[in-house]
């Protein structure tokens, strides 16, 4: 659907599976006059994204290697996918009921999005945080500038949106991030939540506020420490 949207044309899709680990998709342009594909649905954080391309592209140089029928980056397998695919996937989760306790869901507050969007955003945040917390990678953050560098290295190179500004709020590690809108925003917020918890060794709470073209994320400790 993303390719059809970009090419303004319809395609036939067929696939072959050479082995248990590889599926090859074959696209052939369709000449018949058939109904157009559905447009990509919008969330609050995907509107006006065409104004925000530069933060997605300025991630520096890196080398991706063709290996074993796929792509390899720094020893890890990876894939390339259009960001709109993520939006389509998340849009289909809006009617799903979240299976998480009140203690978890109440650790994140939202301003500026609908209840259906809150459910989708929250599910994505905790899923991404859970994936990162499974790794053993240490996270050390000593200053606001290190947040930017860490995000560029761990998120930006893989196509995820990075914060445009970072500012410390107090001596207990609370910090606020400013983002432009992006289809990958929920994933980046979930990653930052996991990074913060690992760097500070505390359970995080988040306040997320959406404006017309930006999102502001405040992360602080869920528990009060004396």
What role is predicted for each listed range?
Residues 2-7, 189-200:
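Short, non-transmembrane amphipathic alpha-helical segments
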Residues 46-49, 198-202:
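Short, surface-exposed linear patches
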């Amino acid at each position: 659907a993303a390719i059809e949207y970009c090419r303004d044309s319809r395609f036939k899709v067929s696939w072959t599976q050479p082995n248990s680990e590889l599926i090859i998709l074959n696209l052939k342009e369709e000449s018949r006059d058939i109904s157009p594909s559905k447009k990509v649905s919008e969330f609050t954080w995907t509107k006006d994204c065409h104004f925000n391309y530069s933060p997605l592209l300025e991630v520096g140089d890196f080398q991706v290697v063709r290996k074993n029928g796929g792509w390899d980056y720094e020893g890890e397998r990876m894939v390339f996918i259009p960001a709109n695919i993520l939006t389509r996937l998340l849009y289909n989760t809006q009617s799903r009921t979240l299976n998480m306790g009140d203690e978890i869901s109440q650790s994140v507050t939202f301003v500026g999005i609908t209840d259906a969007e809150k459910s989708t955003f929250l599910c994505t945040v905790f899923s991404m945080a859970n994936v990162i917390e499974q790794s053993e990678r240490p996270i050390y953050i000593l200053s606001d500038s290190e947040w930017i560098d860490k995000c560029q290295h761990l998120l930006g190179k893989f196509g995820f949106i990075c914060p445009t500004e970072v500012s410390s709020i107090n001596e207990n590690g609370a910090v606020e991030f400013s983002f432009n809108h992006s289809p990958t925003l929920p994933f980046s917020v979930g990653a930052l939540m996991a990074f913060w918890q690992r760097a500070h060794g505390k359970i995080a709470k988040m306040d997320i506020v959406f404006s017309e073209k930006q999102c502001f994320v405040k992360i602080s400790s869920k528990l009060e420490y004396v």
